[in-house]
Amino acid sequence: MIAFILMFIISCFLGPDGFTSFLYIFLSSYVGHVVLHDDLFYYLPYSILHRYHHEIHSPFSYFINILSELSQLTLALFLLPLNPWSMLYGALMFVTIHYINYSWLHINTYHEKHHENVTSNMSPDIIDVVFGTKHPDTPFFEDTTHMIPNVILCALFVFWLKQYYTPSWKRYFCYISSILILLLSTTAFIIKNKT
């Protein structure tokens, strides 16, 4: 729980709308994950890539899923007036915790329980508690102390980047994001046709 509190405190220093933007990404990561597992959205490119992540555990599937998750945030930045620093901070938090802590280091069984039952442990943990999607074999509140290095290092990186940001980056960010989304859509199409 301490890591979540620390995340929200840090988000307050990312700008006047930092907290609300981080709250948005916190809630949307849960809702987005639920949507990715819903049959109604089975053929969306992001759902195809996410299913691939569940079925095949390889460096390629991790890489594609990381790109997919980061590109989803670029769509939100184009459509909603959110704080880009909070969005970047939230994205880095999600990706580093999901892939480094859970998938590579296997800090606990929280994420593995989600792979056993895709309707449980959608994450973040506190949201699973609120919506009743906690896996019955996981503690009511996850010990989040393993997230503290991620929280601190991601915050330092975002604050450093914010200090050296120039407005011309936005144009390049849009170009790169567009190419990334095109790449992911093409990859999803290829994976769908192979399965």
Protein language model features and the residues they cover:
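Hydrophobic core of alpha-helical transmembrane segments in multi-pass integral membrane proteins
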Residues: 2-12, 73-79, 91, 95, ...
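Transmembrane helix interruption/hinge and helix-loop junction motifs
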Residues: 14-21, 78-88, 161-169
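Transmembrane alpha-helical segments that form the membrane-embedded catalytic/substrate-channel core
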Residues: 27-45, 88-110, 159-164, 180-194
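Membrane-interfacial alpha-helical segments at the cytosolic side of multi-pass membrane proteins
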Residues: 71-84, 122
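Juxtamembrane helix-capping/reentrant segments at transmembrane boundaries
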Residues: 47-75
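Membrane-proximal soluble regions of multi-pass membrane proteins
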Residues: 43, 101-142
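Membrane-interface helix-loop junction between the first two transmembrane segments
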Residues: 35-56, 169
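Early transmembrane hairpin module of multi-pass membrane proteins
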Residues: 1-11, 16-45
